[in-house]
Amino acid sequence: ISLVSCAHRETTYVYGSPLPVADPVFKGVAQIFLDREEGQVTGTAFAFADNGSEIYMLTADHICQEVGRGVIATTIPPHEGTREKYAGRVVYTSEDGDTCILRLEEASGAFEVLRFAPESPRTGDRVYTIGAPSGAFPTKTEGYVVGHDFLGTEADESDDPKMILITSVPAYGGNSGGPVYNERHEVVGMISAVHHEYPHSSISVHVEFLLTHVDIYFKQKSNLYFQ
């Protein structure tokens, strides 16, 4: 199986889709920038917790790669003025789950906290993502849930957390870490990669696996308020 990551390796500040007021997810998504040995990379992240002083965001591990790395998160472009920037650090990574957690300092209230879907998505559900493909942020695209593995099958009824979600949502460099969400604006996954043989499809980390990693991190930080 050949997968291609959706990180973008050139810093670009291109404004994407106009902000639709009706979609609250836009206010919970950030374009992120990290410095690595090969240069600066950019991707997408989304807020999932706010403890009153700090914002916690999820993104893809293949962007972050290591705990302690600095990150800059920027808000959506306003109609007038400049985007706000917030500094933070990588506080959790999981290579096998391609999941990374960021902590933004003094950023409480800067981003809307997105909700996780209480139920697993079903094949045929309409889903959306917001990201920074080729640096164009924010860009919203949509598609449908194809399945929960590379065969396009439904999820089984086991208690094991589902790991991946296949959708027909287009994804390109810069989309990595973007939320995949349903028509109720609930997160059902996170963009991770595109299938090399099927570029019209994207591979996401399933919401159940995201929650597993969130639980692992916050159990280690039990003194923090988790919303």
What does each of the following model-derived ranges do?
Residues 9-20, 70-72, 187-227:
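C-terminal cap/linker of serine protease catalytic domains
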Residues 112-162, 171-175, 191-202:
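Flexible, gly/ser-rich surface segments that form the specificity/activation loops bordering the active-site cleft
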Residues 46, 170-191:
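Catalytic nucleophile loop of clan PA
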Residues 17-18, 29-57, 85-86, 177, ...:
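A conserved glycine-rich beta-strand in the N-terminal activation segment of trypsin-fold
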Residues 79, 91-98, 148-165:
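Gly/Ser-enriched beta-turn/beta-hairpin loop segments
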Residues 3-5:
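C-terminal motif of bacterial Sec signal peptides marking the signal peptidase cleavage site
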Residues 13, 17-21, 46-48, 89-91, ...:
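Active-site substrate-binding loop(s) of clan PA
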Residues 8-9, 48-96, 193:
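Catalytic-histidine neighborhood of serine endopeptidases
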